[in-house]
C-alpha cells in the first residue's frame, strides 16, 4: 500500500514527506517532481509569496541512481522565506518572544478552533501548519504516485472547471490533447472561450480587496476495472477519494461523475447502460464491456468499472482578505478587523494541481493493493496476468 506523512510549518525551514510502499525499480527524478511543483506555483491570481518561493524537491532517501530501491522515500521542499523567520519559528527556547504572539484569529481559517483545541494563546502555532503551504510537499508526493501510475499507462489531468460561477466547457479531446490544452492556459482551464472572462473577474475581485473560489475537475484515464472494494466502507474507492479531496485546504465539496446532479434526474437518465463487444478487447481495450455514458464517473459500488475516473471538487474563496472581516482577539476579547500583508486572490488553478496529486495518491494506493509487489517487475507480472483475465471475462 501507499503510505505517507507530511511535516513542516509554512515558515519553518522545510516541508518533509516520507513515503512507504513504493516498489523497487521505479524511475524517479527530482526534475520530474519539480515540474509539478512549478505548476502548483503558477496560475493567474497568485499572491506575493510566489515571488519568494521557487519550490524544488530534494530526494533524501529511497532512490539510487534514478530508481527506487524499495525503502522509504524521503522528500523535502525548502522554504526560502525561512531566512526571515529563523528566530520567530525557532525550536530553541532562547528565542522565545511573547511580544510577537498572534492573538487575532482570522475568519475562515483554523486559527480559533485550533487554538481552542490545542490550548494555544498564540495562533501562529495553528496557522503555520494549517496553511495551504503544506500542499507543496503533497504535490511532490503525488508526483511519485503519478510516476507509478504512468508506468502502467494510467494518466491524470486536473483543470479549472469553474471560477466564480463562470463555467468552462470541456472539449472532446483525448487525455494527451486535453493536457496540452490546459498547459497553454494561464488559468489551467480547458475552455479558452471563457478564460478572458475569468481573468477579468479575478482583476475585479482583486481591486475590491476580495477573493474568489471555483471548481476543479480531475480525470484519470487508463484505470482498469477492479480497484477498490465494496466489502467494507473504508475500502470503497470513491469514499477514499472523497476524503482525500476534502483534506485539501479550502475544499468544501466533492462530486464523482454526475454527482449532485444525479439527485435531480430519474434513474433511467443516471445509470450507465452496459454493452459488450468481444472485438474491443482484441483492438486494445482492456475488456469487451463498455458504456456510452459515464455518469458514475468510473466507479460503481466503490469499485472502478474501467471507465475514466471523473472527480469534481469545490474550493471556497481564500479567507485571507485585503477587505477586512470582523473578528475577536482571543486574549483581550476585543473586536477588530482582520488584515493581511500578502495573499492570493485566486488559487483555484493551483488547487487543480493539488487535486490531481491527491487523486493520484489514492489511485496508486488502490493499484498497489490490487497488484502489489516488492518490485516494479513483480507488479508488471501481476498486472499483465490480470489484464489477460479481463479480456476473457
From Swiss-Prot:
It is an enzyme of class 4 (lyase). It catalyses: 5-O-(1-carboxyvinyl)-3-phosphoshikimate = chorismate + phosphate. Pfam families: Chorismate_synt. GO terms for biological process: amino acid biosynthetic process; aromatic amino acid family biosynthetic process; chorismate biosynthetic process. Its EC number is 4.2.3.5. FMN binds at residues 129-131, 249-250, 301, 316-320, 342. Pathway: Metabolic intermediate biosynthesis; chorismate biosynthesis; chorismate from D-erythrose 4-phosphate and phosphoenolpyruvate: step 7/7. Reduced FMN (FMNH(2)). CDD domains: Chorismate_synthase. One of its GO terms (cellular component) is cytosol. Belongs to the chorismate synthase family. Homotetramer. This reaction introduces a second double bond into the aromatic ring system. This is Chorismate synthase. It comes from Geotalea daltonii (strain DSM 22248 / JCM 15807 / FRC-32).
Amino acid at each position: 500500500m501507499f503510505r505517507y506523512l507530511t511535516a513542516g510549518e509554512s515558515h519553518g525551514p522545510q516541508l518533509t514527506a516520507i513515503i512507504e510502499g513504493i516498489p523497487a525499480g521505479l524511475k524517479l527524478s527530482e526534475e520530474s517532481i519539480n515540474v509539478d511543483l512549478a505548476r502548483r506555483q503558477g496560475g493567474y491570481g497568485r499572491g506575493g509569496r510566489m515571488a519568494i518561493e521557487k519550490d524544488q524537491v530534494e530526494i533524501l532517501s529511497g532512490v539510487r541512481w534514478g530508481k527506487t530501491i524499495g525503502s522509504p522515500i524521503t522528500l523535502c521542499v525548502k522554504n526560502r522565506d525561512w531566512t526571515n523567520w529563523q528566530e520567530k519559528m525557532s525550536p530553541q527556547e532562547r528565542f522565545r518572544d511573547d511580544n510577537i504572539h498572534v492573538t487575532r484569529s482570522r475568519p475562515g481559517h483554523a486559527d480559533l478552533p485550533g487554538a481552542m483545541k490545542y490550548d494555544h494563546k498564540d495562533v501562529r502555532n495553528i496557522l503555520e501548519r494549517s496553511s495551504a503551504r503544506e500542499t507543496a510537499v503533497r504535490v511532490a508526493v503525488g508526483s511519485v504516485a503519478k510516476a507509478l501510475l504512468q508506468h502502467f499507462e494510467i494518466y491524470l489531468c486536473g483543470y479549472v472547471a469553474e471560477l466564480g460561477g463562470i463555467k468552462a466547457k470541456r472539449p472532446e479531446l483525448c487525455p494527451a490533447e486535453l493536457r496540452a490544452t490546459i498547459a497553454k492556459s494561464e488559468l489551467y482551464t480547458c475552455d479558452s472561450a471563457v478564460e478572458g472572462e475569468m481573468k477579468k473577474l479575478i482583476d475585479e475581485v482583486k481591486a475590491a480587496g476580495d477573493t474568489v473560489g471555483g471548481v476543479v475537475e480531475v480525470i484519470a484515464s487508463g484505470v482498469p476495472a477492479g480497484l477498490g472494494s465494496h466489502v467494507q466502507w473504508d475500502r470503497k474507492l470513491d469514499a477514499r477519494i472523497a476524503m482525500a479531496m476534502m483534506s485539501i485546504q479550502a475544499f468544501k465539496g466533492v462530486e464523482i461523475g454526475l454527482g449532485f446532479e444525479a439527485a435531480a434526474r430519474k434513474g433511467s437518465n443516471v445509470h450507465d447502460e452496459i454493452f459488450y463487444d468481444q472485438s474491443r478487447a482484441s483492438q486494445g481495450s482492456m475488456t469487451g464491456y463498455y458504456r456510452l455514458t459515464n455518469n458514475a464517473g468510473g466507479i460503481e459500488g466503490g469499485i472502478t468499472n474501467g471507465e475514466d475516473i471523473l472527480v469534481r471538487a469545490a474550493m471556497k474563496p481564500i479567507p485571507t482578505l485585503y477587505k477586512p472581516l470582523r473578528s475577536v482577539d482571543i486574549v483581550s476579547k476585543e473586536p477588530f478587523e482582520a488584515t493581511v500583508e500578502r495573499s492570493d486572490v485566486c488559487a483555484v488553478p493551483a488547487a487543480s494541481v493539488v487535486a490531481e496529486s491527491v487523486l493520484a495518491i489514492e489511485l496508486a494506493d488502490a493499484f498497489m493493493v490490487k497488484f502489489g509487489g516488492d518490485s516494479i517487475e513483480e507488479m508488471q507480472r501481476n498486472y499483465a496476468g490480470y489484464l489477460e483475465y479481463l479480456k476473457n471475462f
